Amino acid sequence: MKHSRALRARNWLLFWTLFIGLGAVAGAAAMLLDPSGKALGMDAMLPYFQVLPFAETVFQDFTFSGWALLLVNGLTNLTAAGLLLRKKPAGVILGGIFGITLMLWICIQFYMFPLNFMSTAYFLFGAVQAATGYAAWVFAKQKAFRVDPKDYKNVGTDPRRLVVYFSRMGYVRKMAYEAADRTGAEIYEIMSTERTAGTLGFWWCGRYGMHRWPMPIVPVVYPLKRKVAVNRRRLFLFGQYSRSHKVPRL
């Protein structure tokens, strides 16, 4: 069975929430079991915490830091992972948000510590998690998007009108059907000979928009000229089409 890119993004987000969440729980447990930090050689880090507010009260050992790590990055990410496993939409949203939370957490470390590999790596992990969450959310929205021609009962009732459109993901198709339904026009979809589907299709088609190149299309088999010229009706056009296949507008 072919997996959608929405499912792949969701699975990657699940990995990141589990990776960050379990790692945070392990780190918090180490801090709470040995607040002095000597067992893992973390006691040398305590002087850096003294630049933070209320350091003389809450940062004399790792007790407060352990609870903060558990609540901010541990339980939150594991909650998002649980929602993702249950296929709840909130899991995608929270997974992305908690990636941003991790980045903010690391920004505090950038303020406290000299530049180091661990903080930089986890900042990048947070950025990737946030980006993955956003991608999973967008892909899920795209996957759920539907245009059912049966919902537009008035399309084709006025053969004097015609709506012509090009749509890569279906959004312009919805606009075209709505316009045709309002006017009773017939409808015709222009198809490209280039790859347009999926993420690769997005980047492939983007070249044409960036360079303003004409995109090659499948030859038009609908008698557009005859219909428009004879009926003298305005042609509604949605999307882009090749300059070599321009349709007359009256």
Regions found by a protein language model. Give the residues of each.
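Topology signature of small-to-medium multi-pass alpha-helical membrane proteins
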Residues: 2-155, 177, 229, 243-250
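Active-site-proximal alpha-helix that buttresses catalytic centers in soluble enzyme cores
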Residues: 131-250
